[in-house]
């Protein structure tokens, strides 16, 4: 039987269904505070499974204990009528997966800035002794200003806890480290590897490994050398290519030891300004951005003003100035 969409859960008034599978996500309103939130509810079929229920609540407890500007905030969690729910901040924008597919990630510098924010978020959870284990574009949200937020701690685990699922592959095939593929217990280094895959895809516009099924993907992860040619073709800075190569080293010990090193390398590239735009692959066209469609005289404005909000602000100032000119002009005419 299909789960009926609730009209209210606790103090949260449901406004719209946003999507989901094992969990349903809704846009809702906190009737006490008046703020808009995202409400994640475990579906009926999963709510009747004690293990699924326990994992959902574990995710909620873990995520609610983490506070960082680049990690989605969890405000509340609980259970109503046997269904666990989680209340998160409501985000405008889209997933990084959608942004990559629609070529809305911006220029090379903007893409590096997105990666840097993600790296800082992962570094923070590592300081909290948490391994995410599922770093991928679908689990990163990007707003219209390019602010990135890491989300979905569904299979995250405390770094010092050995889970019962060791011996099984846990994660998303394309982004799994070799040790995840082998079903070994993972450390922070697994997230470093997955970040390398994400950075590769973000800059090259394609995954480093392509295959038609999980078995072939796993074989390539374990045995095939990393193909760096797409990164060279995309004119990615050599220092960043080297960083990706190190992050995606098959032995965990050969990867950078922590995101302080990873983020430092990205920051250095941004400081040096050794950035090249990525040419569009043959036969593809990027969707024009809001800035691309501006008249040339507006494209010279500072970045904060090259947005709908910024232009609205300028329009308001212009209207006030025009009104003032007319008003004082009429006053002057009366005096004369």
Sequence positions of predicted segments:
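Conserved N-lobe ATP-binding subsite of Hanks-type protein kinase domains
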Residues: 24
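AlphaC helix of the eukaryotic protein kinase fold
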Residues: 43-65
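Activation-segment/catalytic-loop signature of the eukaryotic protein kinase fold
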Residues: 77
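C-terminal lobe helix-coil module of Hanks-type protein kinase domains
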Residues: 122, 141, 172-277
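Conserved short submotifs of the Hanks-type protein kinase catalytic core
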Residues: 81-95, 99
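Protein kinase catalytic-loop region centered on the HRD/HxD motif
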Residues: 120-130
């Amino acid at each position: 039987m299909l789960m009926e969409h609730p009209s209210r859960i606790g103090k949260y008034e449901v406004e719209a269904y946003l999507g989901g599978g094992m969990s349903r996500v809704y846009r809702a309103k906190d009737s006490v505070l008046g703020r808009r939130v995202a409400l994640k509810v475990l579906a009926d079929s999963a709510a009747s499974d004690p293990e699924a229920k326990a994992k959902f609540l574990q995710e909620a407890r873990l995520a609610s204990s983490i506070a960082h500007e680049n990690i989605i905030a969890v405000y509340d969690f609980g259970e109503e009528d046997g269904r666990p729910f989680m209340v998160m901040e409501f985000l405008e924008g889209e997933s990084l997966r959608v942004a990559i597919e629609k070529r809305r990630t911006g220029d090379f510098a903007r893409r590096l800035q997105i990666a840097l924010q993600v790296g800082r978020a992962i570094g923070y959870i590592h300081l909290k002794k948490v391994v995410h284990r599922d770093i991928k574009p679908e689990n990163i949200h990007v707003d219209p200003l390019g602010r990135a937020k890491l989300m979905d701690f569904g299979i995250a685990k405390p770094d010092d806890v050995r889970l019962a699922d060791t011996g099984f592959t846990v994660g998303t095939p394309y982004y799994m480290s070799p040790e995840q593929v082998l079903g070994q217990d993972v450390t922070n280094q697994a997230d470093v590897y997955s970040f390398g895959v994400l950075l590769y895809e973000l800059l090259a516009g394609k995954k480093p490994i392509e295959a038609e099924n999980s078995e072939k993907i796993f074989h390539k992860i374990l045995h095939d050398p990393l193909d760096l040619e797409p990164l060279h073709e995309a004119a990615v800075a050599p220092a960043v290519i080297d960083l990706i190569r190190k992050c995606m080293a098959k032995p965990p010990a050969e990867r950078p030891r922590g995101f302080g090193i990873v983020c430092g390398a990205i920051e250095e590239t941004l400081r040096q300004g050794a950035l090249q735009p990525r040419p569009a692959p043959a036969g593809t066209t990027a969707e024009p951005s809001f800035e691309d469609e501006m008249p040339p005289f507006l494209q010279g404005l500072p970045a904060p003003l090259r947005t709908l909000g910024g232009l609205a602000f300028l329009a308001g100032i212009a209207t006030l100035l025009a009104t003032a000119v007319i008003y004082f002009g009429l006053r002057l005419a009366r005096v004369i």
